[in-house]
Amino acid sequence: MTSKLKVLQVIPKLGYGGAETGCYDLAHFLGENDCLSCIVTSGGELVRFINKKKVKLIKLPVQSKNPILILFNAIALVFIILFNNISIVHVRSRAPAWSCLLATKITRRKFVTTFHGTYNFKNSVKKFYNSVMVRSSLIIAGSNFIFLHVNRNYSKYLNVKKRFLVIFRGINVDYFESSTISESEENQQLKDWGLDKSKK
């Protein structure tokens, strides 16, 4: 059976932040739903939890802002995209976004970015560097605040050909379902936090 989608996510380091856990969760969701799911990262705490049967993990120095390494990563990504027949490249950070932009231009694959925060831009050079996050064909803002921030500060890089939308961060409601926690676990947690059960 052929995969429905072939998605490559690129993230500097797979730690415990919002962008990182979002990447991790999406990678496993895709892998569990008959899609080819790949992550390119330099490493991080979450790497050891990746289910290698569901998600293909490739390590590259994508955390680096060094222009030579950005170019090296772009060339490596071209080979990864072609070898795995990737259809969508999704990135959540600026330095690897430049590598992904180059790689998707060469391979003509769909390029998606998620704008998670308000990047510092004290001068036009920094603003240009940040602008890579709005140079994709689909731009995702993590909140209404970020959506307004991007429209206000990067409007010259936006055009009608680009889709720009808000996708709010979600949680797995099955995992956080209160009925899955035993009364003894709940009591222990309340005790650990110094909370009174009668006041909840």
Label the predicted regions:
Residues 154-155, 177-195:
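A short helix/loop element that forms part of the nucleotide-sugar donor recognition site in Leloir-type
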Residues 8, 196-200:
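Conserved donor-binding/catalytic core segment of Leloir-type glycosyltransferases
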Residues 136-166, 171-178:
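A short, active-site helix/loop in glycosyltransferases that binds the activated sugar's phosphate group
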Residues 91-97, 115:
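Short His-centered aromatic/hydrophobic patch
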Residues 105, 111-142, 148, 158:
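A conserved, positively charged/aromatic
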Residues 45-46, 95-96, 145-147:
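Alpha-helix capping/helix-boundary segments
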